[in-house]
Amino acid sequence: MDADGSQTLEAQVDALMDGLRADLERLASIPSVAFPGYPPEPVEEAHDLLVSLLREAGVPTIERIDLPDTAPVIYGEIPPPHPDAPTVLLYGHYDVQPAGNPTLWLSPPFEPTPVPGVPGALRARGIADDKSNVIAHLGMLRVYGGRPPVGIKLVIEGQEEYGSPFDDYPPTDPERFACDAMVIADLGNLRPGTPTLTTGLRGACEVMVEVRTLKEARHSGEFGGAAPDALLVLLRALATLHDEHGDVAVPGLRRDPWEGTTYTEEEFRLLASVRDGLPLIGTGSLGERLWSGPAVTVIGLDAPDVAGAASAVVPYARAKLNLRFHPLQDAKEARTALVKHLRAQRPFGIPLTVTPGDTGPGFEARTGGPAYRAALTALKEAWGTEASYVATGGSIPLVNGLARAAPGAEVLLFGAQDSMCNLHAPNERVLLSEVRNTVVAMAAFVREYAADFRAPQAPRTPQAAPSPGGAQ
């Protein structure tokens, strides 16, 4: 306890953890997948549960934002306790990725299950991404009994994973999203136990490539050797995307050195589950390959499956590509570079049909202001060690929309996930210790930010954070 007999912040959070765990398990048991072809009822169920939990936590104003072609967004407000207090916007999402092949899971994906041999770990789809962070927001509110020392605006999205027109909505209603700082909690730490602030997000886009060569399949014995094989044409085109070292070979995609914190090669090999004896691809530092340079991944392929393959020349093949690009490169510019490269390919003289898909811009955060100072103090208090600065290869499309709506706000990116959570993969898991520390960090952050925001500001030298361009 403190000198005045009150509980310490950590003791308060520890007393809340049983209830927060129970609520996390309830939320993670709901298959709130907001992809086409999935039932909408679980998404509504997750929405309603969160609204109920937020009301119980003391949020007086909760609205449902309904836009065409997207799941409902939860918007909540707690007014500032006094006119001089800052306002903090908290972001998360309650939808999840599809579970994929259930046979690859060690337990049912929507039955939260302790992970044997990993103390305090729970396994379920969405339990880390992003329901852990939504529960961390809830925990912070419970610490303060719904009356934190700052104003609060909550934005909890329902269709982040599939993509949503809500990404472009905040700039159309800037008053609603006005704030002094925002905490984007859709990520987490470089490794368990290492508090991490993310300062850059790579952008993302998708491109479809199709090849049609025959009206229908033909016997490979009679026609193979002269009839053009659509799958072979496609594979030759895809092979031009990288050079012999594995570096992306598409002209016009930005790549800069990275000089900030990153993984060791041993950590990365373990995290990426690279088989023993195989090399990593690409050149340069891991930070450069993962964060400040491009990556092109073939994420889907339409072609005959091996088990049912006939001895026939393939008439049609299609691939879906995912491009991740430098945080500061324009999204349309990056997508155009990839499309232009593919359209220039003519394997065996055969053209490709290239269809541009959706884009999500990258983002680089400003550092050094009062919110960042408060976050550094809070993260150290929660984890007991100084925070690291990193970037991430993932993207959070709404960040740019929120930043345009509140251009003066400091944007902080931290949360309860860690690099071993198996995000978007089978056997996703979260560590309750990271959830607990994130609640402590969020509660300490609003306390420190409220004090620093209203205190006279003496000149300070901001702590520099590495940018995606490598500057210190």
Regions found by a protein language model. Give the residues of each.
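Histidine/acidic-residue-rich, glycine-tolerant segments that coordinate divalent metal ions
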Residues: 148-228
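A generic structural motif
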Residues: 128, 215-217, 323-330
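Active-site metal-coordination/substrate-binding segment of hydrolases
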Residues: 85-153, 175, 437
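N-terminal helical capping/dimerization or prosegment-like subdomains
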Residues: 2-102, 316, 320, 333
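A common structural junction motif
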Residues: 95, 241-245, 339-349
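An extended, acidic, His-containing surface patch that forms the Zn2+-binding/catalytic region
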Residues: 56, 83, 164, 191-192, ...
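Polar, glycine-rich mid-to-C-terminal structural blocks
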Residues: 214-217, 221, 226-271
